[in-house]
């Protein structure tokens, strides 16, 4: 396969490398991800993360394994193992469905490579399309609040919600970005803050519990988040804490937008209750670990509830910004997401 480079993915010498997102921002470190075991381990450890990026990394790995001589039956097993790596992220399922079609072709080796590269190119384009559609909703002088990380670290392109923010800033319409630290793994404080700094976008880092105070003081004009899965009724699964922001935004009369590619839609999932929610390790809540070391602050025997995602009901969402354009609550009520199954 040809040499390839995105913010978080690299293909060189027929090997796949991922940018270790657990090491950022203290260290920029590339890790080998050229086996199924390695990539699944990186996904579980969130060294590679973001729904679009997970799907793209799995697709690239399958193509590279095919080129290295793996048989069709071996690739089919690898595909199913990768599919199970992150159950909430539907982009992974959608991308691998396309790779499965390529695997069925007689000349499957070049077909897999072509499909993986096509997915990369499509992701870059849809990020641009999302940014174009979403930035039109950002008014001059906006103070925006965002959660988790939805930029180039999570995609092959400029990002989803963060791509909208970056484009709106380039157009002169963003005054400031409030960045939720995003407990427990601090994707906002570590990754989004780093990306905005690299882009030169003014931001202020806050703890998750400060959002309500900011909204009450009139310091937030809109909330922008990404999505790991969008159900047919418009419910959205995203990083834990998203639902809280949506409730707060609704109470304070602040627009709440979800930016995501069409690959995040799951028209076969009727509503948020049907979305599987990944439960993660207690250690993520009882302490913190990173390239700086590890600290535990909770008692050794503390019992922990640690879902990676929550579900935001469609009734709390002002608009879904896709690469195909802006979808309104009225559109969703008419079943626009359900028709995607046709």
Swiss-Prot record:
This is Methylthioribose-1-phosphate isomerase. InterPro entries: IF-2B-related (IPR000649), IF-M1Pi (IPR005251), IF_2B-like_C (IPR042529), Initiation_fac_2B_a/b/d (IPR011559), M1Pi_N (IPR027363), NagB/RpiA_transferase-like (IPR037171). Keywords: Amino-acid biosynthesis, Isomerase, Methionine biosynthesis. The gene is mtnA. Pathway: Amino-acid biosynthesis; L-methionine biosynthesis via salvage pathway; L-methionine from S-methyl-5-thio-alpha-D-ribose 1-phosphate: step 1/6. The lineage of its organism: Bacteria, Pseudomonadati, Pseudomonadota, Gammaproteobacteria, Enterobacterales. It is an enzyme of class 5 (isomerase). HAMAP family: Salvage_MtnA. It catalyses: 5-(methylsulfanyl)-alpha-D-ribose 1-phosphate = 5-(methylsulfanyl)-D-ribulose 1-phosphate. One of its GO terms (biological process) is L-methionine salvage from methylthioadenosine. Transmembrane segments: none annotated. Catalyzes the interconversion of methylthioribose-1-phosphate (MTR-1-P) into methylthioribulose-1-phosphate (MTRu-1-P).
